[in-house]
């Protein structure tokens, strides 16, 4: 194994048709390397890859292995081993190159391989290596079910996807036309059938939460349970290549209670990255009308950045409940394949995992973009399944960032725009609220609890964050709920009176300041800040 890896990172270029690749990928990979040698190997691979093109070649072999896994009726363990090793080796060296790249066009990847080379006859001449790779990986993820035999390969492919799409993190906070992300851009160009199958399979992985067999053995680990050479490479590289995984940690920093599934978590993370990717349209770019990757007609290019249409986001927004008849789905004149899954199972899975931030983002994406799922949520009689975790997180707002609080409030704001929802929450009685510390709450309605928690969030924001937009969202939710309030608990009514008392005093203070002729334009800056923070409260009370 050591000699094979020395050849892989060395300066001798092996043709893609060489037996070297088969021998490398069939190794059990049980030897361990010290950290300094691992780093030396990573640097050598990145430097020699300019002329060996070994990265592109191993990615091509990965696709060939995946094609063999997909087409064969029964897949041998050696084929799985080759595919897993190819995915794992690729992800490690890709991660290192991406983190240390100096150019934003990713020339260090050296993916421009000569298509006339022997052995590359099966690769279409008009397809780039990155397109060929993404098509192979996405086709496997979307077409092959997770099983005890394939779960390790699915796991490595999802990890590889995270690395491939991490090039975004080397760009600025906002997309620009000059941004180049070769792999995720190639993913956006895939056929609609592949897109729909990938979105559906990633959602099903999240819902079903498949577990890796406890008695299984991962080919990249040695027989004694210790880490093999690739695991050693991965752990060492992680100390230097922090950007992709640690930045994506925004989505997955909070782990849900109960049984966890790495496959489910990674599937959700990959799905979120795919559906929220935005690529700017260049001012000089010509977009064909028959392209899958089209501009958004609602965006004015002159006034704001225009983005290509995201096919994965579109597939999620058009997803249908599996209980609908196929004729109903076809009658909606959907273009192309439609993602179909059980909304009931998705609803239950979200309710179980909502303490995890990535699940909150998925729920927001669904209720904001998918009208069918939003309607399904609104007609459910067990709304506490979703609302209780959200309210508990708002109750613990001091442990959350303002962005996380925003996401929770926007979900409530969207739902509270429906009169049926507002009426339903007051009819649903909760036997107890164990996480509410200030007082015991028995036999209180879900609507009363929402009022209490929202008012508590407002007061916390006034004392700590002083964010006017949080005021706006909280008060807007209360305003939506107001006409449908029914049988509020005594405690909720008391909190409403307390809120009105606080706001009325602030209103009086603001009115006095406004009407005070002695108030000068050069008043103290701190006082001006107070006026700015409380203006939204003044507007709400004045209206």
PLM region descriptions:
Residues 72, 143-146, 372, 396, ...:
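General structural signal for alpha-helix termini and helix-helix connectors
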Residues 1-87, 95-103:
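N-terminal alpha-helical scaffolding segments that mark the starts
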Residues 1-9, 15, 22, 42, ...:
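Alpha-helical repeat/alpha-solenoid scaffolds of the HEAT/ARM/MIF4G superfamily
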Residues 55-74, 136-143, 239-253, 387-394, ...:
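Short amphipathic alpha-helical segments and their helix-coil junctions
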Residues 391, 401-543:
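Eukaryotic scaffolding regions of large macromolecular assemblies
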Residues 51, 55-58, 82, 86, ...:
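Alpha-helical interaction elements in eukaryotic regulators
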């Amino acid at each position: 194994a050591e000699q094979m890896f020395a050849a892989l990172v060395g300066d001798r270029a092996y043709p893609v048709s060489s037996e070297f690749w088969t021998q490398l990928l069939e190794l059990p990979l049980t030897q361990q390397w010290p950290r300094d040698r691992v780093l030396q190997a990573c640097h050598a691979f990145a430097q020699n890859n300019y002329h060996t093109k070994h990265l592109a070649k191993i990615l091509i072999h990965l696709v060939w292995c995946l094609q063999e896994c997909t087409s064969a009726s029964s897949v041998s363990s050696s084929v799985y081993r080759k595919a897993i090793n190819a995915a794992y080796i690729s992800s490690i060296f890709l991660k290192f190159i991406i983190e240390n790249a100096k150019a934003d066009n990713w020339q260090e990847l050296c993916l421009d391989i000569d298509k006339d080379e022997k052995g590359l006859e099966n690769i279409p001449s008009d397809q780039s290596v990155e397109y060929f790779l993404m098509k192979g990986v996405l086709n496997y993820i979307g077409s092959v079910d997770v099983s005890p035999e394939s779960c390790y390969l699915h796991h490595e492919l999802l990890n590889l996807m995270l690395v491939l799409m991490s090039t975004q993190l080397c760009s600025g906070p906002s997309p620009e036309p000059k941004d180049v992300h070769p792999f995720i851009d190639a993913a956006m160009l895939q056929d609609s059938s592949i897109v729909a199958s990938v979105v559906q399979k990633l959602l099903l992985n999240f819902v079903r939460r498949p577990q890796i067999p406890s008695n299984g053995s991962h080919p990249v680990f040695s027989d004694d349970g210790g880490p093999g050479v690739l695991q050693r490479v991965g752990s060492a590289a992680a100390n230097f290549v922090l950007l992709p995984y640690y930045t994506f940690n925004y989505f997955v920093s909070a782990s849900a209670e109960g049984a966890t599934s790495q496959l489910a978590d990674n599937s959700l993370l990959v799905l979120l990255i795919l559906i929220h990717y935005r690529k700017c349209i260049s001012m000089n770019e010509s977009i064909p009308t028959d392209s899958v990757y089209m501009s958004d007609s609602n965006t004015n290019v002159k006034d704001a950045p225009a983005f290509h249409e995201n096919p994965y986001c579109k597939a999620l927004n058009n997803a249908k409940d599996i209980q609908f008849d196929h004729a109903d789905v076809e009658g909606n004149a959907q273009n192309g394949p439609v993602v179909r899954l059980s909304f009931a199972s998705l609803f239950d899975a979200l309710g179980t995992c909502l303490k995890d931030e990535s699940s909150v983002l998925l729920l927001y994406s669904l209720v904001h973009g998918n009208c069918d799922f939003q309607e399904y949520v609104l007609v459910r009689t067990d709304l506490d399944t979703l609302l209780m975790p959200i309210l508990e997180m708002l109750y613990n707002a001091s442990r959350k960032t303002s962005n996380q609080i925003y996401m929770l409030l926007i979900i409530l704001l969207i739902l509270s725009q429906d009169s049926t929802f507002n009426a339903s929450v007051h009819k649903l009685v909760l036997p107890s609220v164990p996480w509410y510390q200030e007082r015991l709450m028995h036999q209180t309605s879900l609507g009363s609890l929402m009022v209490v928690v929202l008012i508590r969030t407002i007061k916390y924001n006034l004392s700590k964050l002083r964010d006017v937009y949080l005021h706006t969202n909280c008060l807007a939710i209360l305003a939506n709920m107001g006409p449908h309030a029914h049988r509020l608990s005594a405690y909720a009514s008391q909190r409403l009176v307390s809120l009105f008392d606080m706001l009325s005093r602030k209103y009086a203070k603001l009115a006095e300041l406004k009407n005070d002729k002695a108030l000068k334009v050069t008043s103290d800056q701190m006082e001006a800040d107070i006026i700015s923070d409380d203006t939204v409260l003044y507007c709400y009370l004045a209206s």
